[in-house]
Amino acid sequence: MKAEKTSLAVLTAQLTSPDGWQQLLPKGEFRSRDGSPTDVAHWFIDGTIAQNLIHKARQLNQDLLVDYDHETILKAKKGIDAGNVVAAGWFNADEIQWFDDETRQGLYIKPRWTPKAYQQIKDGEFAFLSAVFPYDENGTPLELRMAALTNDPGITGMQRLAVLSATLNPQENVKMPESLRKLLAKLGVEIAEGVELTEEQANTALNALETLQTDKTKADEQVATLSAKNTEVDLSQYVPKATYDAVMSQVAVLSAKTDDVEIDNHISKARNEGRAVEAEVEYLKQFGKQQGVAALSAMLEKRPQIAVLSAQQTQTTKVEKPVEKGTAVLSAADKEAAKLLGISEQDYAKELEAK
């Protein structure tokens, strides 16, 4: 397979952005003021290519160097160890971004300057930022190798370097407030102590906050909708509490009266059947009121019948008058015969005895 031909480009941009984002490459087609590139018609970058550059930088898993006047490249050309190059700053994939609006177009980086470089830029000692990147035969940048502070720009019309006095230098190791760490944790973003907040984490926290605001708005709308609905009570489904309480009170009274009647009936029945005696009537009434009619009935049903009590309480014994001695006992037919004869029953009985 034919190897893809790549070349190395060095371009320069002015440092002017007050928010820390510095233009590294312009949007669209561009060339260097020295006539480069000579092997392709021009270089070209758009949003898609920029995202590929950011992806490549993230795969490095380390910071990219910003040196002074491409000292790293110059030493490499001379065969000198580049390990002694002084860094002016550093940046990573989270500090590379594509802009395309009215004020900014192109690829931007947000370097973390060393204290020395920060002061030099602030004092105007350096004004431009130069990019180093390999490109293919179509002039498409393949990755960002590094950048450099310089006063010899590769292209014209780029933005100048600028810093704000409020810009924080990472060398100062400013600690994130504990309250901010807790707030971010509530939004689902955990930040370890001493670790800086990345752009991705900040966007995650912002999205979580926007979601909470959206949910609150929906909840407020639902409350307003429910409040606006007709709240009149359907009397076919509900009754006033006072009415309910009065009805339940009457039911309780009627139930108590009914229970008393049933208790008396059960006790009376038990006495008639020989299962209870007069002496325990009051006890049985109290038992029924306390334990219920069903419990009283079950208890009395289990009791055996006492024959003596049953006979005394439920049967009436008819005592016949003793018949006078010597007087026959008349049957109903005899009594009717005496009546027809016009004599008394005693006389008729005597006649029967005489016969």
UniProtKB/Swiss-Prot annotation:
The keyword Protease applies. One of its GO terms (molecular function) is peptidase activity. The keyword Metal-binding does not apply. The lineage of its organism: Bacteria, Pseudomonadati, Pseudomonadota, Gammaproteobacteria, Pasteurellales. This is Mu-like prophage FluMu I protein. Transmembrane segments: none annotated. Potential protease involved in virion morphogenesis. It comes from the Bacteria. Belongs to the peptidase U35 family. Keywords: Hydrolase, Protease.
